UniProtKB/Swiss-Prot annotation:
Membrane listed as a keyword: yes
Organism of this sequence: Neisseria meningitidis serogroup B / serotype 15 (strain H44/76)
Gene Ontology MF terms in the entry: porin activity
Keywords annotated in UniProt: Cell outer membrane, Ion transport, Membrane, Porin, Signal, Transmembrane, Transmembrane beta strand, Transport
PROSITE patterns given in the database record: GRAM_NEG_PORIN (PS00576)
Protein name (record): Major outer membrane protein P.IA
Family to which the UniProt record says this protein belongs: Belongs to the Gram-negative porin family.
SUPFAM superfamilies per record: Porins
One term under GO cellular component: pore complex
Pfam family, one: Porin_1
Subcellular location: Cell outer membrane
Cleaved signal peptide residues: 1-19
Subunit record text: Homotrimer.
CDD domains in the cross-refs: gram_neg_porins
Length: 392
């Protein structure tokens, strides 16, 4: 009897040691369909008889077939915990991992927000892969679940959301206000990258120029200020990098769905800074969120680039159903000091979540995104999805 009791106590010790560890995550997947439309307008020269050359406009339109597939909508699993170190000090840690019920996907542990740190009356200090201040505020403005982060989520607006390998400090709350600062060392910032391309000689022979991976850009700095009072919440997020690897080319690549760090680093810039202001209001079943974003940078020749965008999301709960709509608009961008004519974008996402329980919901959405790429030119994406989400 004594041996059995001893064995029982010993077997319970590991469980007691990890009693403060929480397992959590989301499993979500469904069916998605999308198609692309584009229009290209070209000015061509044609013979005009005695009058000489006459300019002729050629308009080309194209449309893809509807592509439908079963996709994972961003499933993940996480572990987090803490340990009381005494005198109000705690050790905190978290490990998150992307998973996919559709097969494939990321295989490295800790590819989502994962860190270790200390928390106390002074605030919280964390090191690891930590979400930045832009990512903090995005849930309010973009609560959509989808595999298509460009059209079925506000992917262009959220292109600065990141979980960089960094150190971050969050202050305690004072009268509704709190702040944070974050630092990404140069060796942890994304590398500069020039994609492969073809050149043509005088005989029209094509030569492939291979891709070139350069050195890291520079240290990256983030800061944030939050305010919460009753149903109102506000957030300001800031980013600065002296040498950045995100520019207009990255903007284009993100539009067509490229998600790699290398693809995001095609246009090295200087003095890159981003400002985003987000405000939200929640009362009963009503949720409203508004956001504005300004992206500024310089080129090697001292000319300047900028993009200005706005986004809004509204939802209201009717029993188990939560209909929702989002809208985003990007104004004509400025490149090398000159305004790009007809370079804006517009995006609308509408859908509904239906809660079967507190943890399981059906999710339905439809999306439309139109990106103007010059006078008479545009790319349009139409998408729809139906899926199921379970939280644990």
């Amino acid at each position: 009897m004594r041996k059995k009791l001893t064995a029982l106590v010993l077997s319970a010790l590991p469980l007691a040691a990890v009693a403060d560890v929480s397992l959590y995550g989301e499993i979500k997947a469904g069916v998605e369909g999308r198609n692309y439309q584009l229009q290209l307008t070209e000015a061509q020269a044609a013979n005009g008889g005695a009058s000489g050359q006459v300019k002729v406009t050629k308009v080309t339109k194209a449309k893809s077939r509807i592509r439908t597939k079963i996709s994972d909508f961003g499933s993940f699993i996480g572990f987090k915990g803490s340990e009381d170190l005494g005198d109000g000090l705690k050790a905190v840690w978290q490990l998150e991992q992307d998973v996919s019920v559709a097969g494939g996907g990321a295989t490295q542990w800790g590819n989502r927000e994962s860190f270790i740190g200390l928390a106390g009356e002074f605030g919280t200090l964390r090191a690891g892969r930590v979400a930045n201040q832009f990512d903090d505020a995005s849930q309010a403005i973009d609560p959509w679940d989808s595999n298509n982060d460009v059209a079925s989520q506000l992917g262009i607006f959220k292109r600065h959301d990141d979980m960089p390998v960094s150190v971050r400090y969050d202050s305690p709350e004072f009268s509704g206000f709190s702040g944070s600062v974050q630092f990404v060392p140069i060796q942890n910032s994304k590398s500069a990258y020039t994609p492969a391309y073809y050149t043509k000689d005088t005989n029209n022979n094509l030569t492939l120029v291979p891709a070139v991976v350069g050195k890291p850009g520079s240290d990256v700095y983030y800061a944030g200020l939050n305010y919460k009072n009753g149903g109102f919440a506000g957030n300001y997020a800031f980013k600065y990098a002296r040498h950045a690897n995100v520019g207009r080319n990255a903007f284009e690549l993100f539009l067509i769905g490229s998600g790699s760090d290398q693809a995001k680093g095609t246009d090295p810039l200087k003095n890159h800074q981003v400002h985003r202001l987000t405000g939200g209001y929640e009362e009963g079943g009503l949720n409203l969120a508004l956001a504005a974003q300004l992206d500024l940078s310089e080129n090697g020749d001292k000319t300047k680039n900028s993009t200005t965008e706005i986004a809004a999301t509204a939802s209201y709960r009717f029993g188990n159903a939560v209909p929702r709509i989002s809208y985003a608009h990007g104004f004509d961008f400025i490149e090398r000091g000159k305004k790009g004519e007809n370079t804006s974008y517009d995006q609308i996402i509408a859908g509904v979540d239906y809660d079967f329980s507190k943890r399981t919901s059906a999710i339905v959405s439809g999306a439309w995104l139109k990106r103007n790429t010059g006078i008479g030119n545009y790319t349009q994406i139409n998408a729809a999805s139906v899926g199921l989400r379970h939280k644990f």
